[in-house]
Amino acid sequence: HQKAKQAIDNGYFKKGILPIEINETYINEKNKRANRTYTIDTDEGVRADTTIEALAKLKPAFAVKGSVTAGNSSQTSDGSSFVMVMSEKLMNSLGLKPIGRLVNCASAGVHPRIMGIGPIAAVPKVLKQAGMTQDQIDLFELNEAFASQSLAVIRTLNLDINKVNINGGAIALGH
């Protein structure tokens, strides 16, 4: 949440968010129908006021002595996104500027009982296919269904934490 809040405050997401105007009908405090209009232009799930102390007080979600809580799990979010993947030739013909480059891709499976650790198998595979090392990667965007799963990936792959989800991940921004 802290990384996502900082990214929002610094305007990092502004160019990537299309503001949506909402016209809402609701029942007000006088139990009467009312209307209001507002604009959504910022991710709503980020809890800027979350503290380590507050998170430590949350009860486990799945097992009595478990580590997964509502505070270290991603919320379900309402949003959408898209990306355009195209050849350099098409990009140039359309006069577009790239924001990234797809160097290679790979898929890898892990045992289904261990959810969320696919990158442990996929990252070394794709790096080998591309003839690259982790040091050549500037940023790792890992899904964060649960913090424990993300930490397992980061620790097993020995990733530089300063290169992982630098603007927040799914725990703050949504799954």
Where is each model-derived feature located?
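Short, well-ordered amphipathic alpha-helical segments that serve as non-catalytic structural scaffolds
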Residues: H1-K3, V85-K89, G116-A130, S148-L151
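N-terminal extracellular/periplasmic Venus flytrap/periplasmic-binding protein-like
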Residues: H1-S93, T156-K163
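A short structural micro-motif
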Residues: K3-Q6, A108, F146
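Beta-strand segments within the central parallel beta-sheet cores of soluble alpha/beta enzyme folds
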Residues: I17-I22, L96-S107, D135-E144, K163-G169
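Short glycine/threonine-rich loop-to-helix capping motif typified by GTGT followed
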Residues: N31-K32, P112-P119, E144-N162
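A glycine-rich, aromatic-flanked flexible loop/lid motif
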Residues: M91-R101, I117-P119
